Amino acid sequence: TVDDVIWTFNTLTTKGTPFYRFYYGNVAKVFQTGERTVRFNFKPGENRELPLILGQLTILPKHYWEIRDFTKTTLEPPLGSGPYKITKFEPGRTITLTRVKEWWGKDLPVNRGLYNFDTIRYDYYRDGTIALEAFKAGEYDYRAENASKAWATAYDIPNVRNGLIRKQEITHNRSSGMQAFVFNTRRE
Protein backbone atom coordinates (compact mmCIF):
# COMPACT_ATOMS: atom_id res chain seq x y z
CA THR A 1 0.00 0.00 0.00
CA VAL A 2 0.96 3.65 -0.20
CA ASP A 3 1.17 3.71 3.60
CA ASP A 4 3.62 0.79 3.48
CA VAL A 5 5.86 2.61 0.98
CA ILE A 6 5.94 5.85 2.96
CA TRP A 7 6.33 4.05 6.31
CA THR A 8 9.18 1.92 4.94
CA PHE A 9 11.06 4.91 3.57
CA ASN A 10 10.63 6.97 6.74
CA THR A 11 11.54 4.05 9.00
CA LEU A 12 14.66 3.10 7.07
CA THR A 13 15.89 6.70 7.01
CA THR A 14 15.24 7.31 10.72
CA LYS A 15 15.67 3.91 12.41
CA GLY A 16 17.58 1.94 9.80
CA THR A 17 21.33 1.55 9.61
CA PRO A 18 23.44 4.54 8.49
CA PHE A 19 23.67 2.88 5.08
CA TYR A 20 19.99 3.64 4.42
CA ARG A 21 20.28 7.24 5.61
CA PHE A 22 23.11 7.75 3.15
CA TYR A 23 21.53 5.69 0.36
CA TYR A 24 18.26 7.62 0.41
CA GLY A 25 19.74 10.90 1.64
CA ASN A 26 19.06 12.76 -1.62
CA VAL A 27 15.30 12.41 -1.22
CA ALA A 28 13.83 15.68 0.07
CA LYS A 29 10.28 14.46 0.62
CA VAL A 30 7.98 11.49 0.07
CA PHE A 31 4.21 11.86 0.00
CA GLN A 32 0.99 10.29 -1.26
CA THR A 33 -0.40 11.70 -4.50
CA GLY A 34 -3.31 9.32 -5.06
CA GLU A 35 -4.97 6.18 -3.78
CA ARG A 36 -2.15 4.00 -5.12
CA THR A 37 0.61 6.46 -5.98
CA VAL A 38 3.57 7.96 -4.14
CA ARG A 39 5.86 10.81 -5.12
CA PHE A 40 9.52 11.18 -4.15
CA ASN A 41 10.92 14.70 -4.46
CA PHE A 42 14.69 14.80 -4.87
CA LYS A 43 17.11 17.33 -3.46
CA PRO A 44 18.87 19.45 -6.07
CA GLY A 45 21.96 17.77 -7.42
CA GLU A 46 23.34 15.30 -9.87
CA ASN A 47 22.41 11.88 -8.49
CA ARG A 48 21.25 10.26 -11.71
CA GLU A 49 21.03 6.86 -10.03
CA LEU A 50 18.43 7.93 -7.49
CA PRO A 51 15.36 6.76 -9.47
CA LEU A 52 17.00 3.33 -9.89
CA ILE A 53 18.00 3.26 -6.22
CA LEU A 54 14.43 4.02 -5.13
CA GLY A 55 13.16 1.31 -7.45
CA GLN A 56 15.16 -1.16 -5.35
CA LEU A 57 13.41 -0.14 -2.12
CA THR A 58 12.07 -3.26 -0.43
CA ILE A 59 8.63 -2.39 0.90
CA LEU A 60 7.95 -3.55 4.45
CA PRO A 61 4.41 -4.20 5.74
CA LYS A 62 3.58 -1.37 8.15
CA HIS A 63 0.94 -3.38 10.04
CA TYR A 64 3.53 -6.04 10.88
CA TRP A 65 6.46 -3.84 11.84
CA GLU A 66 4.73 -1.02 13.68
CA ILE A 67 3.93 -3.39 16.59
CA ARG A 68 7.55 -4.60 16.77
CA ASP A 69 10.76 -2.81 17.71
CA PHE A 70 12.37 -2.23 14.33
CA THR A 71 15.73 -1.46 15.93
CA LYS A 72 16.02 -4.82 17.74
CA THR A 73 17.58 -7.95 16.32
CA THR A 74 15.23 -10.93 16.18
CA LEU A 75 15.19 -14.52 15.00
CA GLU A 76 11.48 -14.35 14.17
CA PRO A 77 11.07 -14.89 10.41
CA PRO A 78 9.62 -11.67 8.99
CA LEU A 79 6.32 -11.40 7.17
CA GLY A 80 6.85 -11.22 3.43
CA SER A 81 4.81 -11.11 0.23
CA GLY A 82 7.07 -13.13 -2.05
CA PRO A 83 6.85 -16.61 -3.55
CA TYR A 84 8.74 -18.26 -0.65
CA LYS A 85 8.62 -18.15 3.14
CA ILE A 86 11.22 -19.10 5.73
CA THR A 87 10.27 -22.44 7.26
CA LYS A 88 13.46 -23.58 8.98
CA PHE A 89 16.83 -22.07 9.87
CA GLU A 90 19.93 -22.45 11.97
CA PRO A 91 21.53 -19.04 12.49
CA GLY A 92 24.84 -18.78 10.70
CA ARG A 93 24.51 -22.22 9.11
CA THR A 94 21.44 -22.80 6.96
CA ILE A 95 18.04 -21.44 5.94
CA THR A 96 15.21 -23.32 4.21
CA LEU A 97 12.55 -21.59 2.14
CA THR A 98 9.26 -23.21 1.15
CA ARG A 99 7.17 -22.11 -1.82
CA VAL A 100 3.92 -20.33 -0.98
CA LYS A 101 1.33 -22.33 -2.92
CA GLU A 102 -1.25 -19.53 -2.95
CA TRP A 103 1.22 -16.73 -3.75
CA TRP A 104 -0.57 -13.75 -5.28
CA GLY A 105 1.91 -13.38 -8.17
CA LYS A 106 2.18 -16.99 -9.35
CA ASP A 107 0.04 -16.51 -12.47
CA LEU A 108 1.46 -13.19 -13.64
CA PRO A 109 3.10 -13.50 -17.07
CA VAL A 110 6.32 -11.95 -15.76
CA ASN A 111 6.72 -14.88 -13.34
CA ARG A 112 6.18 -17.64 -15.90
CA GLY A 113 8.98 -20.19 -15.59
CA LEU A 114 10.15 -18.83 -12.23
CA TYR A 115 9.83 -20.08 -8.65
CA ASN A 116 9.53 -23.74 -9.64
CA PHE A 117 11.16 -25.35 -6.61
CA ASP A 118 9.02 -26.42 -3.65
CA THR A 119 11.93 -25.97 -1.24
CA ILE A 120 15.22 -24.12 -1.44
CA ARG A 121 17.98 -24.57 1.12
CA TYR A 122 20.89 -22.19 1.52
CA ASP A 123 23.95 -23.36 3.43
CA TYR A 124 26.33 -20.67 4.64
CA TYR A 125 30.10 -20.98 4.58
CA ARG A 126 32.23 -18.48 6.48
CA ASP A 127 35.23 -19.10 4.26
CA GLY A 128 35.16 -18.75 0.48
CA THR A 129 37.80 -21.42 -0.07
CA ILE A 130 35.84 -23.95 1.99
CA ALA A 131 32.66 -23.03 0.10
CA LEU A 132 34.38 -23.63 -3.24
CA GLU A 133 35.73 -26.99 -2.10
CA ALA A 134 32.27 -27.98 -0.79
CA PHE A 135 30.81 -27.15 -4.20
CA LYS A 136 33.44 -29.24 -5.97
CA ALA A 137 32.62 -32.12 -3.60
CA GLY A 138 28.91 -31.95 -4.48
CA GLU A 139 27.71 -30.50 -1.16
CA TYR A 140 25.57 -27.94 -2.95
CA ASP A 141 24.19 -27.53 -6.46
CA TYR A 142 24.68 -23.96 -7.64
CA ARG A 143 27.52 -21.48 -7.32
CA ALA A 144 27.80 -17.96 -8.66
CA GLU A 145 31.46 -17.10 -9.12
CA ASN A 146 32.49 -13.46 -9.12
CA ALA A 147 36.25 -13.81 -8.69
CA SER A 148 37.95 -13.78 -12.07
CA LYS A 149 40.96 -15.73 -10.80
CA ALA A 150 38.76 -18.55 -9.46
CA TRP A 151 36.70 -18.54 -12.68
CA ALA A 152 39.88 -18.97 -14.72
CA THR A 153 41.70 -21.52 -12.55
CA ALA A 154 39.59 -23.18 -9.84
CA TYR A 155 37.25 -25.19 -12.03
CA ASP A 156 39.73 -27.34 -13.92
CA ILE A 157 38.31 -30.47 -12.27
CA PRO A 158 36.96 -33.80 -13.55
CA ASN A 159 33.29 -32.95 -12.89
CA VAL A 160 33.55 -29.89 -15.15
CA ARG A 161 35.37 -31.79 -17.87
CA ASN A 162 32.87 -34.69 -17.85
CA GLY A 163 29.81 -32.40 -17.77
CA LEU A 164 28.53 -33.06 -14.24
CA ILE A 165 29.24 -29.42 -13.44
CA ARG A 166 28.43 -26.90 -16.14
CA LYS A 167 30.51 -23.74 -16.10
CA GLN A 168 28.47 -21.11 -17.88
CA GLU A 169 28.38 -17.34 -18.22
CA ILE A 170 24.84 -16.09 -17.77
CA THR A 171 23.90 -12.61 -18.97
CA HIS A 172 21.39 -11.09 -16.58
CA ASN A 173 20.56 -7.87 -18.49
CA ARG A 174 20.11 -5.85 -15.30
CA SER A 175 21.76 -2.58 -14.45
CA SER A 176 24.55 -3.27 -12.01
CA GLY A 177 27.67 -1.77 -10.58
CA MET A 178 31.18 -2.68 -11.54
CA GLN A 179 33.99 -4.66 -9.98
CA ALA A 180 37.25 -2.76 -10.23
CA PHE A 181 40.03 -0.88 -8.53
CA VAL A 182 39.56 2.84 -9.13
CA PHE A 183 42.44 5.14 -8.28
CA ASN A 184 42.06 8.80 -7.40
CA THR A 185 44.93 10.40 -9.32
CA ARG A 186 43.91 14.02 -8.74
CA ARG A 187 46.56 16.20 -7.18
CA GLU A 188 44.17 18.53 -5.36
Give a label for each model feature.
Residues 54-121, 126-130:
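Gly/Pro-rich hinge or "lid" segments in bacterial periplasmic/extracellular proteins
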Residues 12, 29-31, 87-98, 123-187:
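Extracellular/periplasmic solute-recognition and catalytic clefts
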Residues 20-64, 83-90, 186:
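Surface-exposed binding/hinge segments that line
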Residues 15-24, 72-79, 159-164:
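Short, solvent-exposed secondary-structure boundary motifs
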